[in-house]
């Protein structure tokens, strides 16, 4: 079956450009263009948006983004072998696809884009988590992007959207949910990828809130959450002891039982504690 964009099927593209997946680049490709179109739709209405795609590889998701109407796609790819395949896509969508060859961890794509900007990526898990944390912790809020639509290992996706009370709830959940609305919008079995990874995957869609859910200084909140979850089995009066000599009183003032553990504490209480700490004389 020929694709709606008139380009060849992805299996053919991969064979022609000898794009055999390399493990060290975390390459697990999506070859089903119906699926990549569905992921592109999960990113929201792309018409009138510039989209940053990180790790386009042979371009399945890139084709989905363009077919779903993205105004402009800026694709950052580390593997030079993918560039000829991406150039063919750029020719099929004149003026709408720009490809940068490089490491997404080292490139600032902003110079190339006009808001509104959405970010979409199917990346190796470690690169994806590092970029997510950077995108969630800019110097100022709101950030330059409107939404992030990112593929993760399912277990990592569950940590991003986790609620208090379970093992999945930790720093990543607090960081993500403090300033975004985060949802799992799709789960994918290993067979959706070539080659198939060992684990299930999930797409998380994060929409930037105009401001944080509850006021707090980001650095203080980060300190509280890091200390609390680094020793998540300990009671907070012990795990947070190093933050302030009067930590028990500050916990009580924030409405938190000093005997509680970090994984029982919701965002609102963490923020109240961060405010109390910031205001407390030492
Ligand atoms: N988006 C394609 C798809 O869905 O079929 C490819 C996904 S594959 C999981 C990850 C892609 O990210 C590969 O093309 C790989 O070369 C690229 N990649 C890995 N590390 C990268 C980095 N640091 N910067 C940019 N691209 C990277």
Swiss-Prot record:
Q: Which reaction does it catalyse?
A: adenosine(1518)/adenosine(1519) in 16S rRNA + 4 S-adenosyl-L-methionine = N(6)-dimethyladenosine(1518)/N(6)-dimethyladenosine(1519) in 16S rRNA + 4 S-adenosyl-L-homocysteine + 4 H(+)
Localization, UniProt: Cytoplasm
For this protein, the record's CDD domains field holds: AdoMet_MTases (cd02440)
Indicate which residues the UniProt annotation says bind S-adenosyl-L-methionine.
28, 30, 55, 77, 103, 122
Q: What is its main location?
A: cytoplasm
* Cellular component terms (Gene Ontology): cytosol
Its top-level enzyme class, in one word, is: transferase
The record ties this protein, via Pfam families, to: RrnaAD (PF00398)
For the keyword RNA-binding, the answer is yes
Keywords (A to Z) from UniProt: Cytoplasm, Methyltransferase, RNA-binding, rRNA processing, S-adenosyl-L-methionine, Transferase
Which superkingdom?
Bacteria
* UniProt keyword RNA-binding present: yes
Q: Which GO terms describe its molecular function?
A: 16S rRNA (adenine(1518)-N(6)/adenine(1519)-N(6))-dimethyltransferase activity; RNA binding
EC numbers: 2.1.1.182
In the record, the note on similarity to other proteins reads: Belongs to the class I-like SAM-binding methyltransferase superfamily. rRNA adenine N(6)-methyltransferase family. RsmA subfamily.
The task this protein performs is described as: Specifically dimethylates two adjacent adenosines (A1518 and A1519) in the loop of a conserved hairpin near the 3'-end of 16S rRNA in the 30S particle. May play a critical role in biogenesis of 30S subunits.
Stated name of the protein:
Ribosomal RNA small subunit methyltransferase A
Annotated organism of origin = Paracoccus denitrificans (strain Pd 1222)
Give the source lineage, highest ranks first: Bacteria, Pseudomonadati, Pseudomonadota, Alphaproteobacteria, Rhodobacterales
């Amino acid at each position: 079956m020929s694709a709606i964009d008139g380009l060849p099927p992805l299996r053919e593209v991969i064979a022609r450009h000898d794009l055999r997946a390399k493990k060290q680049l975390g390459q697990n490709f999506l070859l089903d263009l119906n699926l990549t179109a569905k992921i592109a739709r999960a990113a929201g209405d792309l018409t009138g948006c510039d989209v940053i795609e990180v790790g386009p590889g042979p371009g399945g998701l890139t084709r989905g983004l363009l077919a779903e109407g993205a105004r402009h796609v800026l694709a950052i790819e580390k593997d030079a072998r993918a560039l000829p395949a991406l150039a063919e896509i750029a020719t099929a969508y004149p003026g709408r696809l720009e490809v940068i060859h490089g490491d997404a961890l080292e490139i600032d794509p902003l110079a190339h884009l006009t808001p509104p900007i959405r970010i979409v990526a199917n990346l190796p898990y470690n690169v994806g988590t590092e970029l997510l944390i950077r995108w969630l912790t800019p110097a100022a809020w709101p950030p330059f992007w409107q939404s992030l639509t990112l593929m993760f290992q399912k277990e990592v996706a569950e940590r991003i959207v986790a609620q208090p009370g379970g093992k999945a709830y930790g720093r990543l959940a607090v960081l993500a949910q403090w300033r975004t609305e985060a949802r799992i919008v799709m789960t994918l079995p290993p067979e959706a990828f070539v080659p198939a990874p060992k684990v299930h995957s999930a797409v998380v869609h994060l929409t930037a809130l105009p401001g944080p859910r509850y006021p707090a200084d980001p650095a203080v909140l980060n300190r509280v959450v890091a200390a609390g979850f680094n020793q998540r089995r300990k009671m907070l009066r012990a795990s947070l002891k190093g933050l302030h000599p009067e930590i028990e009183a500050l916990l009580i003032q924030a409405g938190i039982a000093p005997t509680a553990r970090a994984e029982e504490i919701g965002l609102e209480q963490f923020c109240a504690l961060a405010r109390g700490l910031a205001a407390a004389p030492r």
